[in-house]
């Protein structure tokens, strides 16, 4: 059996006297779609914040391809190929759609100050390649015709897709999506489902998803992890989770 691309053991996060995350375990295989579900306030986003370096976990291990990454700052984790979206759209609203993508591409540009100042052939070539890659991802998320529109003027579902495209500009190995279907209508949710499937099948991306839309979760996930009150409650296939009495109780309460 191959080693998981991401493995989390005993993840713990305290805020003073509050134990927000308590002993969460997670294994993600390459090219899987793994969903993390649970009632509001269960600690799911806190887990994401620990995995991506926004929080420094109090305890536990986070391994990416066997390398421990807990405690690393967010930008170093991103450079290792782990990127994320947030519950709230975080685009540069005054910039165009294509400019939002180019911002995410800066680390891959073969440029420096002098090259930019003198517009060297290497700089121009790097700039051209960045534009071509941005155009590619605008096409992948069906936003080509909106390339020069300000991001803030796009429909909400379009902004969500643009956020995912911006993540993909960094060539990630793991894409973490925090409630990407929140606020979407059924057609937009179907488009999101198709996009996630495409990222996995055509771009070899592993997806870790927080989502409350159970229809989407059950239809797209290979594996589901359930968290309740900061602690692991259950994990398994969609079929196993659907019929788990502890999961049903956590969502619906006891009769």
Swiss-Prot record:
Q: Which SUPFAM superfamilies match?
A: P-loop containing nucleoside triphosphate hydrolases
Listed GO MF terms: ATP binding; ATP hydrolysis activity; L-isoleucine transmembrane transporter activity; L-phenylalanine transmembrane transporter activity; L-valine transmembrane transporter activity
Q: Does the keyword Transferase apply?
A: no
Residues annotated as domain ABC transporter: 6-254
Q: Which residues form a coiled coil?
A: none
Q: Spell out the GO cellular component terms annotated for this protein, sorted alphabetically and separated by semicolons.
A: plasma membrane
Q: Pfam families given for it? A: ABC_tran, BCA_ABC_TP_C
Q: Where in the cell is it found?
A: Cell inner membrane
The family classification in the record reads: Belongs to the ABC transporter superfamily.
Specify the protein name: High-affinity branched-chain amino acid transport ATP-binding protein BraF
What's the source species for this entry?
Pseudomonas aeruginosa (strain ATCC 15692 / DSM 22644 / CIP 104116 / JCM 14847 / LMG 12228 / 1C / PRS 101 / PAO1)
